[in-house]
A protein has these predicted regions:
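Hot-dog-fold acyl-thioester-processing enzymes
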Residues: 2-90, 152-171, 176, 180-274, ...
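A cross-kingdom feature marking solvent-exposed beta-strand/loop segments within repeated
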Residues: 88-99, 113-115, 270-281, 296
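Short, structured motif recognition centered on aromatic/hydrophobic residues
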Residues: 38, 92, 107-111, 127, ...
Length: 349
């Protein structure tokens, strides 16, 4: 007697429809152990995510989870339902961090499908979802939109009516939340004398340092977030893929590039919003990540705190001081891995 399949094959493009609500399994409680592992794997050096005493003096309740760390956990919860059969995660928009995530907090994740469009090849389609992470008190701690290219189950299945969501180019500075009172910020302990007043729109910052990513560590990082995407783990299964080997989770690139940005942006450690993001090209074990940033905008949030809108560009195996980005035809330059636009809090003088 044949039994019904009890394992999860993941959703294909045909399984999604606009308005679909998905409750993702396995809430995750984050601890100080998670903070230590994240620091070990991403190299995070920002003072408010390294020292409990500094964090309290800087207006946080204590040693908090880095917002990107929490983002990866919430993202990871959505993978089995959204992107287990994905070809690629294409981009991010309208990401907002509402509350700090503290050790002992438990993150739950839900998503709503807000857009869908079959690709012209008839083999894949793009699905847009808004994913929200809440804590154990059902308080939203973050929300973001991402879109992913997903395989169809059958190429001959009819295409659904296309719905493409209208997304903001950036989170308005007036809607940023969760920023601290930074009047007692200690420049000596933070590692930089530069504040909001020292950065100019259009300024580019070479973050100088590089970090080579190895096979084992990127898998440990991805498992930390309980991200189960096949392309990151199954070496045997990926032999017949487009690249013939495992891909490094794009979140690893974001976190390492962000950690490298400490050298030049040490006082801008708290991410307030994700405006946009694209994984431009793949990263593989043995590649080295470098990064540079451009100041896109500035905004005053309070008497003690400002925000910098930053474009973080990660490049592979090349000098970040060349500021590789796009050519005259609008195409990304060779070696560009990541184009990530975000707001960060920074103390004012």
């Amino acid at each position: 007697m044949a039994s019904a399949q009890k394992s999860n094959p993941g959703n294909y493009f045909e399984d999604f429809h606009v308005g679909m609500d998905i409750v993702h399994a396995t809430p995750q409680t984050l601890t100080e152990g998670d903070i230590a592992l994240y620091r070990a794997m991403a190299g995070n050096r920002f003072a408010q995510y390294s020292s409990a005493e500094f964090a309290r003096a800087a207006g946080l309740p204590g040693l908090a989870i880095d917002p990107l760390h929490a983002f990866h956990v919430v993202f990871g919860k959505s993978v089995p339902d959204i992107s287990l059969n994905a070809v690629a995660n294409l981009g991010y928009a309208d990401g907002r961090f509402f509350l700090p995530v503290m050790p002992g907090d438990t993150l739950n994740t839900v998503s709503k499908v807000i857009g869908i469009k079959e690709n012209s090849n008839g083999k894949t389609g793009v699905v847009w979802v808004r994913t929200t992470g809440t804590n154990q008190r059902a308080e939203p701690v973050m929300s973001f939109v991402r879109w992913v290219m997903v395989n169809k189950y059958e190429m001959d299945n009819p295409a659904p009516e296309a719905v493409v969501p209208d997304l903001p180019a950036a989170v308005p500075a007036s809607e940023l939340s969760g920023f601290p009172d930074m009047k007692t910020w200690d420049m000596a302990l933070s590692g930089s004398p530069y504040t909001y007043d020292d950065y100019a729109v259009g300024e580019k910052i070479n973050h100088v340092d590089g970090m080579t990513v190895e096979e084992a560590e990127h898998q440990i990082a991805t498992r930390l977030y309980q991200n189960t995407a096949k392309v990151h783990f199954d070496a045997h299964g990926q032999k017949d893929s487009r690249f013939g080997k495992r891909l490094i989770y794009g979140g690893v690139v974001i976190s390492i590039a962000r950690s490298l940005a400490f050298n030049g942006l040490a006082n801008a450690g708290q991410m307030l919003a994700i405006n946009a993001g694209s994984h431009v090209s793949p990263l593989f074990a043995g590649d080295t990540i470098y990064a540079w940033s451009e100041v896109l905008d500035k905004a005053t949030l309070s008497d003690t705190c400002g925000a910098l809108r930053l474009r973080l560009v990660a490049v592979k195996d090349q000098d970040p001081g060349a500021f590789a980005y796009k050519s005259d035809d609008g195409k990304y330059a060779g070696g560009v891995l990541l184009d990530f636009d975000y707001w960060a809090a920074i103390p004012k003088r």
